[in-house]
Amino acid sequence: MKISIGVREIAYFLYASGDLSQDFFSNASARDGIMAHQYLQHKYKAEDKKEYFIKSDIKINDYELELSGRIDGVLKEGVEIVLEEIKSTRLKLEDIDIDYHREHLAQLKLYGYMYCDAEDLPSIKLRLTYINTRTYDTTYFDLLITKDELKEFYYDSLEKYIDWINVLEEKRKDRIDTIKTIHFPYDKIRDGQRDMMKASYYTLSHKNILYAIAPTGIGKTMATIFSGLKSMKHDREKLFYLTGKSTGKKVAEESLRLLIDKGLKVKALSLTSKAKSCLNDTPVCDPAKCIYAKGYFDRLQQALVYAYNSYNLFTPDVIRELAKEYNICPFEFSLDLSELCDVIICDYNYVFDPKAHLIRYFDDSLYKPKLLIDEAHNLVSRARDMYSAEIRFNSIINLYNLLKDKGHLIYEDILRLEDMLKGYERLMIDQNIYYQPLFDNNIYDIFRVIREKVELILQNDEHIDNRNEIAVIYFDIVGFLNIADIYSEAHRFIVEEDNSDYNIKITCLDAREYTYNIIKNKVEGCVLFSATLYPINYYMELITKGDGKYINLKSPFNPSNLKILIDANVSTKYKDREKTIDDIIDDSNVVLNTNKGNYIIFFPSYKYMELFLEKFKNDEYQIIAQESDLSEEKRIQIFEAFKDTKTPHLGLFVLGGSFSEGMDFIGDLLKGVIIVGVGLPQVNLINNLEKDYFDNLFGQGFDYAYTYPGFTKVIQAAGRVIRSESDRGIVILIDERYLYNIYKVLMPEHWQNKKYIESPFDLKDDLVSFFNGGDNNG
């Protein structure tokens, strides 16, 4: 049996040692490491070779092993050949010796034998070089070693690794066999679900891009996961299920649990954030202060082997328990464990965010990831946020204070920064804000200098007070500089004056270049799905630059079970709200009094909701108004309150908030929703900058910045009503703009049972007819 293995895999599995240091804790480290590598390699002579690909085939037991890797440098020094392995670090070089991380030297020795064998050399010089990513200072360790010594190490390593290969191969056979034979876990495949599975399977098998408009009830989670698994044919393929909400993760976990219970033998892992997974009261990513970072690599192999042999589904709770048992960092353990898994459930940022994406999968050709992107309509705004950055001037002042006696080192830099910001303040015409299309490189230089000085302070003083607080601001600066490094025509540089503070922003108006690059060039097939991809061309353009195909699946639910009643006689525009609030109250009371039960009214803003509350009276309902700083715990409490059938509840929520999606009000939990307005985002500088940007690009600035994002929120809110085949309910849309043709065109196909009403009397008649089971076709 032929098996392909990376040399680095063998070295790290067998010989990894030491602590989790700052070198392992951020993508900034990895990016800086790449630049440091390139700096050294750029100094190579013409006859030297960099990133030298080497491959070796060897038969051991029943396995034909294909080992491969890239040697950082093959150098000629006189008549001597030197193999160089470069490792970057933030540590002081005097603290590093040749055994700093044993896996580094092991990797180099494996390369050494492969090169000697290929070139028939009796001996060779190995050079392990460490470069500091801040100063670019280097230290190196040379080892002159014979081919025979390397051969002994090489074969000894492979003999040890074969035991692990035996375990992996047994699980691999089980995975391949059960993926082939596993049947769909439900007796019945829903309407639309089969079409979605066929399209998803074809897309992932042919490395294409698919958008699926999949209404509620199709069973899109199981459809995509099942077809995604069926499309997996090779060892290095990994299926990523991306979702932005904890509820979405739970559904994906349960779908995989069901398949595993039915006999599927795959390894699946649900990844959660470092902050949520940390076993300490406060995250302290420092081996001097964290027992889970100290000696992490010394205990990692044992933990990996036990976990892999004992579990199929690694939920966050399972990972935390394993981490406690082996005294290792749960977050880093989950990342290392993910390399042994077939399916990874995670947030969008682990794929798309330059500050957090998983480098091991998306910057390395070793793996072949496939993407399933749930609630893909959220990716547009999420990606813009990922490629934006901001930092407050007061944070830099706070950094100065936290550094105490070392604060003077950045004092002059702070003064320079303050002078520049005051200059921008003088340019502000109104709204205390200034923007320009070009980034200010002088501000970049100041932040870069501050970053370098703080990094040096942290390196040289391991026991500095306020280390964690300093590190938080330090990484904010690092993140800001990283976004500045990829500043483009789609970014705007903004300075905002706010209560004697300055907010310095890099705002991304359009992230499609970045999302498309990842989907097109870093993965092998992508399915994006949501019930609210309207209009589809908007989402395709802003995620994959129009590339890909789409399917529009029919709702599995009887469209007559959802009644859409539209009151287009009321203006909800800002200037008219005081005048028309009584009309909204009248419509609301008609709905609430005609058929008592739980209802939700969605408003465009908290201020509009408060205006309604001031005048609204209805003693028969328990009113629950959403708070602006709603916690997850409070959100669940509100959801649970709707299950109390003794008293009807009226929820007053904000469009686009946590109650607009991801909450399943099944059965009698919700009779209907009233949606006030068309969901337009607030008119502000950022949205107007987007409008101007897309006007120049497509000539549809207002629609791209306001209309489409707004109506997506309307569709999401309306989607709370029908969550199962037996549900019946109503949606009331209130706004004169629903008469506009653009909104009529945007309405989903399953909104067939809709009617425009003339007055509250018409509204009552239609409601009575619907709830009594009368003519539902308007």
Model segments located where?
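A substrate-engagement module of RecA-like helicase motors
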Residues: 176-177, 183, 236-344, 352, ...
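Metal-dependent nuclease catalytic cores that hydrolyze phosphodiester bonds in DNA/RNA
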Residues: 1-80
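A contiguous, basic/glycine-rich beta-loop/short-helix subdomain that forms a polymer-engagement track
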Residues: 319-344, 355-362, 456-571, 579-580, ...
